[in-house]
Amino acid sequence: MKTKTNQSVKTFGIVGFPLSHSLSPLIHNSIYKDRNINASYLVFETQNLNVEKIQEFRNSGILGLSVTIPHKETAFTLADKADDTSRIMKASNTLLIGPDSTYAYNTDGEGAYHSILEFSPESLKTGKVVILGSGGSARGIAFSLAVSGKIQNLLVCSRNEITAKEICLLVTKNSNVKAEPISQDVLLTRKEEISLVIHTTPLGMKGQSPGPYLPEDFFNSNMTLFDIVYNPLETPLVKTAQKAGAKIIPGSEMLLYQAMKQFELFTGISPNAEDIIKTRERLSKALENR
């Protein structure tokens, strides 16, 4: 029987577009080696993700996929079953591919939440949280924060008013958090209310428009900025916030923690403190060389 992968090796991968700068293969393949796990993690760069593509992966022996831009919302629609975050927010960044069914998970929110708790837990207590953007990552992050019990108010600022309103409706309906869509112009007038800014759009990413999305006078030393873009780590938005004295959560931290959860979903093995430390060091070194 012809297959594209070695059946003695458990094969996983990442699907999205573009993927030339993805660090996910480094993360997963390194931890497989550290743990002596007979597995490999491949790159599947494609602009199209559909039922036929999932079946191709299944036929090729692919057991799990990390899903990134622009496929997170599509990934949810292709799954037969889904975790609560995926089901409620209608976006997934992880697919487990079984013989007869596909299961969707969203680890973005958990990754972001862990990052915030580690680097700036106070930012969840002192003011309102605003999420910039309304794509797949924003959905997972919004839900995880809403059900954490740590916040009471959430603002979503996006150029796409329809998806921003949808996220807010879903959050308000499924949690005790009051979520409110807000335009950029209005956000600028309410900056004193904000303690945490989470940027989830591609602006500032290598090869994308630089941004910065918000002006320097929006930020102050009482704010924290979490820009989930990690290539480069110092995006124009990060530099703008730094000049104003804002605290910065590195975007690579979300990549780290969401990948650790994916590793657990793929292999059934819980990552330990050493896995996290080693992966953080590898990411830091890789990003320094970019």
From Swiss-Prot:
GO molecular function list: NADP binding; shikimate 3-dehydrogenase (NADP+) activity
Protein's UniProt name: Shikimate dehydrogenase (NADP(+))
A GO CC term attached to the entry: cytosol
Gene field: aroE
Oxidoreductase is among the record's keywords: yes
InterPro entries reported for this sequence: Aminoacid_DH-like_N_sf, NAD(P)-bd_dom_sf, SDH_C, Shikimate_DH, Shikimate_DH-bd_N, Shikimate_DH_fam
Signal peptide range: none
Catalytic activity field: shikimate + NADP(+) = 3-dehydroshikimate + NADPH + H(+)
Self-association and partners: Homodimer.
Record's function text: Involved in the biosynthesis of the chorismate, which leads to the biosynthesis of aromatic amino acids. Catalyzes the reversible NADPH linked reduction of 3-dehydroshikimate (DHSA) to yield shikimate (SA).
